[in-house]
Amino acid sequence: MDILYIIFGLALVLVGAHILTEGSAAVAEKFGVSEFVIGLTIVAVGTSMPEFVVSSAAAVQGSSDMAIGNVVGSNIFNVFLILGLCALVSPLPFTRNNIRFDIPLVFIASMLLLVVASDALLGLGEVNLIGRIEGALMFLCYIALIAWSVRSSKQDKQEVAAEPRMKMWVAVLAILGGLVALVVGSRLFVNGASSVARSLGVSDALIAITLVACGTSLPELASSLVSVAKGQKGMALGNVLGSNLFNILFILGGCSMITPLTLGDITIIDITMVVMSAVIPFIFAFTLKGRNLNRIEGAAMVAIYVGYVAWLISQVA
């Protein structure tokens, strides 16, 4: 039964990603909004709903490792694997706003997470803990950063399409239907994969950072790859960056307001990888001409993710 959940869940995710991408692109055309802004807001928040549901449920149940590990693992997965694979399909160009605002914003959010989760290292407490006040600060930062990012992206505004690809009510239904399929499909996948992993005796922390994070990030993976395949690269990049901001500031901020989150088996090394996931794309943007993420750099990012997961597994072997 678990295998059927995994297969059916994956199928729903793929179908949902296609429908969501089409609907979102239609909305962008209708209002003359850039694909990046749509990816940063509607698509990013929608595809991060599985992370929100899983982490919120884990926080309520007192499983800090699952709540934090899901977000940490998802952010690492989003950048290194998703952007890496997207770049392998087709090089991803960085816009001026990406370099000046969007990537630095993700870096700042990642550094904020590192600081608030390092109480013991900074001598502020006996354990590394994300408290309610810190969570509220992160939550408010998300609202402010999204408003600023959308406003600063106005210069990327594109012309309204003379003949939109679909009617507005159809586009709205496509977005809603796609999001529902993504959330349900991801949930089925996570339940099936987690059940299989637990039967093998794997720890909650490892499950959260790897299997659960990968499962809840399937919407981002599917929607980003479909966007790139359709030539909507701005939406793919906005989806990943927006999802990472949402995961750190909104999800962890909100969860820690529900109950303080303690880092158990989740280490500072894991959170440092989240910071590196914001630094490396920024570095790659300036390594070669054109300010884009090319196939070689994409392959390097995929290799980094594979190496990180291999290291995690080796720690419990």
Language-model features: locations:
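Hydrophobic alpha-helical segments, chiefly the membrane-spanning helices
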Residues: 1-317
